[in-house]
Amino acid sequence: MKKRVEKDAAYICTTPFQLMSAVTLAVSNGETADVFIDPQFRENEKYIKRLRKTGVFERVTDLGRDTGAVRARNVKNKYLRGLRIKLIHLNIKGAFRKSLGGHRYKKLYTSNNSYFFDLMMRYFLAVDARPQVVFFDDGEGSYDNPKCRIPNKKYVSKDSVTVKYLYSPELYLKMNGRNNREDIRPLPLMDHDKRVRKAIDLIFDTKKIPVVGEPLMILDTMRETCMDEKTAKDYSETLFKVCEKIGKNNVCIKQHPRDKSDTWKGYNIYPDSSVPFELLCMTSDVDKKVIITLSSTAVMMPKILFGKEPVIILLYKLFKMKIADDGGRDKIYKQLRNIYQNKKRVLIPETQEELFSYLDELGKRRGR
């Protein structure tokens, strides 16, 4: 029988962003903590190996090695998938004996009600151990997605207060208002502490990340997922005109990681589309740049993670998308503008003329 081990906390991470946030919070809180990685991102084994070297967490567990749970989730037939997951629920102690056997935690940090969060909480309840559920920042979803903001009622007591660590409590409160059932706490800026920066540099090998030298960045999108063919053509032509106006050599294109098209052949394409934008914010002088995007919420990151204020130009009002906006885009970007010290640096043109007028004005400022 395994000896019981009690620790302050454990973190569940599914994305590189969550991993960076977990490192930031673990160092800030100074707790004795473990981390469990649900490896759904590229090169996860490399990141996990480097994470162990940082010493931030006492124990780093790759949940991908819990092959039964991973295989069940990956079954394509939804009925068979549901059956396989149900069988794991029925044998939850056996399913997680290897990863969790003997371990108890005062707190379980998660960014959302994820698959492995649900399974781990089922395990803890089965062995009569109920950790306090604490949410930590997952980017845009933590501010406007209920799945990332509201804990599953099965795992919190009826009258409990949900603790949430966020990079921008100000933005959260502007988006959602105050709630006496929530305890919103600030998560320090990602590079506030040398230990955090050193750990992130090691995990992601930031010295090898190409620096963006161009003054303008375009965060491109997967056109076929959000536009019809005609709109996609109009969108591309607009961006080509932007590049022509600014000068091709002054523009860096960051393609979507899944975009294999040759749309930008002959332009300055960022050499590794899989590099998280958050890391570019850390390694490049992003506050001195102009960033253009259709509606990528990645543009929130310079401000909320690092306190930097690049010029942001959002184009979503110029093009009709397949999924109609329910007002959510306007809400989050207008509130992002409200937390900028210089609100004129968040631009949302409603016409082509307005877009190119913005670019003319920015060109005049740079020429001074």
Residue ranges of predicted features:
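Active-site and donor-binding regions of nucleotide-sugar-utilizing enzymes
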Residues: 10-159, 299
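N-terminal beta-strand-loop-alpha-helix module at the start
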Residues: 5-46, 215-221, 230-252
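A donor-sugar binding/catalytic signature common to diverse glycosyltransferases
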Residues: 22, 277-325
